[in-house]
Amino acid sequence: MALRGVRVLELAGLAPGPFCGMILADFGAEVVLVDRLGSVNHPSHLARGKRSLALDLKRSPGAAVLRRMCARADVLLEPFRCGVMEKLQLGPETLRQDNPKLIYARLSGFGQSGIFSKVAGHDINYVALSGVLSKIGRSGENPYPPLNLLADFGGGGLMCTLGILLALFERTRSGLGQVIDANMVEGTAYLSTFLWKTQAMGLWAQPRGQNLLDGGAPFYTTYKTADGEFMAVGAIEPQFYTLLLKGLGLESEELPSQMSIEDWPEMKKKFADVFARKTKAEWCQIFDGTDACVTPVLTLEEALHHQHNRERGSFITDEEQHACPRPAPQLSRTPAVPSAKRDPSVGEHTVEVLKDYGFSQEEIHQLHSDRIIESNKLKANL
């Protein structure tokens, strides 16, 4: 796999950090999840392909263990607020002194500087501060968060993964690691570059929910069907819009011009009335295989079984028959081979990991006696 041999230490956190670590593991990296003592499980359920080490970082011997491991690692991924790692004497200056090749990835909400750098937040707060949340929502309604995907996973976990890969690539030239300041506010803002760049064109000149690409246009929104389901319409280009009208049984002559913004509300009512006359399945029979840019709004379960997704193998199942998306993108020579095993229990690989990182049997036994580590396999390995 593409990242075979890359050693990653991921400090336990929520959502974006685990997602970043999972991507790296899916593509072949050796990811060790450094869990807190006493943890019961992994709340983000994104520990696929990782090994778990339970370690008390709040005590100096535990911090010393991590420091020693970082001397042999390629990447450290930490998800804490600004300053936390420095308090533990595990800041980048300290760890990179031992290992100049170490890539120190810092994934936070607000970044390592600025007035918000040490305050708490969640996805909705990061999307709000990026400016993007102001653009999401229906006309006349409050802005609403797009699940917790945009900041946590797009602007956070995925952008941090990109930073790590860039740093790994650059290291092949310089032989040196570097510090990555990945944060969800700036990551989300970067994802919205198109929005910023097209403001001068007037693409977002109307109030929220009344523009071309935010549900304001009658040909770029969703419609309810006769059976209470929904269809998604994205017929922007004139040739696609013509096919949309054909499928709906409408003539362009009986409607205002496609780009007549002032007529969009009435056109939406007209389209809604037509869509409400047939079921989702009936509309699929009409539009599937056409260039009208009309698709069904699928539930997760429906997406799993949709013919297109099944033909491509877009979803996989683990040994417990739980389904999830296959890693993307697909690489032709070195594709991802995600683990089909269950997520590790906390501390399941503590002894194994420490041995791999050069700790002796006696050292491991002492760490356990001092309650610096936990392992549910300790007795079997000592």
Curated annotation (Swiss-Prot):
Record-linked Pfam families: CoA_transf_3 (PF02515)
> Where does this one sit in the cell?
Peroxisome; Mitochondrion
**GO molecular function annotation:** alpha-methylacyl-CoA racemase activity
The cross-references to SUPFAM superfamilies, in alphabetical order and at most eight, read: CoA-transferase family III (CaiB/BaiF)
Location of region: Disordered: 319-347
Ranges spanned by the short sequence motif Microbody targeting signal, renumbered to the chain: 380-382
Give me the reactions it catalyses.
a (2S)-2-methylacyl-CoA = a (2R)-2-methylacyl-CoA; (25R)-3alpha,7alpha,12alpha-trihydroxy-5beta-cholestan-26-oyl-CoA = (25S)-3alpha,7alpha,12alpha-trihydroxy-5beta-cholestan-26-oyl-CoA; (2R,6)-dimethylheptanoyl-CoA = (2S,6)-dimethylheptanoyl-CoA
Keyword Iron-sulfur applies: no
Q: Which InterPro entries match?
A: CoA-transferase_III, CoA-Trfase_fam_III, CoA-Trfase_III_dom3_sf, CoA-Trfase_III_dom_1_sf
For the ligand (substrate), the binding residues are 36, 55-58, 121-126
Q: What Gene Ontology biological process does one annotation of this record name?
A: bile acid biosynthetic process
GO CC annotations?
A: cytoplasm; mitochondrion; peroxisome
What UniProt keywords are attached to this protein's entry?
Acetylation, Isomerase, Mitochondrion, Peroxisome
**Family, as annotated:** Belongs to the CoA-transferase III family.
Annotated function: Catalyzes the interconversion of (R)- and (S)-stereoisomers of alpha-methyl-branched-chain fatty acyl-CoA esters. Acts only on coenzyme A thioesters, not on free fatty acids, and accepts as substrates a wide range of alpha-methylacyl-CoAs, including pristanoyl-CoA, trihydroxycoprostanoyl-CoA (an intermediate in bile acid synthesis), and arylpropionic acids like the anti-inflammatory drug ibuprofen (2-(4-isobutylphenyl)propionic acid) but neither 3-methyl-branched nor linear-chain acyl-CoAs.
Q: What's the name of the protein?
A: Alpha-methylacyl-CoA racemase
